[in-house]
Amino acid sequence: MSKEEKLAIAAATDGACSGNPGPGGWGALIRFQDGSEIEFGGNSPETTNNRMELQAALFILEKLKNIEFAPSLTIKTDSKYLIDGMEKWMPNWKKKGWKTASGKPVLNQDLWKALDHPELPKIKLQYVKGHSGEKDNDRVDAIAVAFSKGRKIQLKDFANN
């Protein structure tokens, strides 16, 4: 798929963990102007819900590097940890050598640093309440939970839209 083929207009991410730590999964989707969607998911055998939230966001940003997207595109997430980390905490962590206000090393530093990579697109995050009936959030949650539990789930791609 080239940048010229489709215009991305919406995105959503979620992470889930069975036990915390425990087996985890993440889900993500991108919706295009023509109504088509692509969905993604992944898992980790031993992780936390926060790591899965960050992994989902990192994956979708990596995908959006190579896709044309509308300037109004936001990434919907139910993770205040992700939003606060990206929008409030990260500048101070960087100033303090990736330490928290209390001087402790930032948790999940590898993923935060990857999310801060200058080649990733800067896209606004939009908070949505989890399990509230918001269609995209419910879908990426279902993907994340399925991957965390090792269940099969049909993901949409351009062939089955």
From Swiss-Prot:
Record-linked SUPFAM superfamilies: Ribonuclease H-like
Cofactor(s) listed: Mg(2+)
Principal place of residence: cytoplasm
One Gene Ontology cellular component annotation held by this UniProt entry: cytoplasm
Keywords for this protein: Cytoplasm, Endonuclease, Hydrolase, Magnesium, Metal-binding, Nuclease
Pfam family, one: RNase_H
Binding site for Mg(2+) 1: 14, 53, 78
Catalyzed reactions: Endonucleolytic cleavage to 5'-phosphomonoester
MF (Gene Ontology): magnesium ion binding; nucleic acid binding; RNA-DNA hybrid ribonuclease activity
The record's free-text note on cofactor binding: Binds 1 Mg(2+) ion per subunit. May bind a second metal ion at a regulatory site, or after substrate binding.
EC number(s) reported in the record: 3.1.26.4
Binding site for Mg(2+) 2: 14, 141
Biological processes annotated in GO: DNA replication, removal of RNA primer
InterPro entries: RNase_H (IPR050092), RNaseH-like_sf (IPR012337), RNaseH_domain (IPR002156), RNaseH_sf (IPR036397), RNaseHI (IPR022892)
PANTHER family (UniProt xref): RIBONUCLEASE H1 (PTHR10642:SF26)
Family to which this protein belongs: Belongs to the RNase H family.
Function in brief: Endonuclease that specifically degrades the RNA of RNA-DNA hybrids.
Subunit organization: Monomer.
Official protein name in the record: Ribonuclease H
Native source species: Prochlorococcus marinus (strain NATL1A)
Organism taxonomic ancestry: Bacteria, Bacillati, Cyanobacteriota, Cyanophyceae, Synechococcales
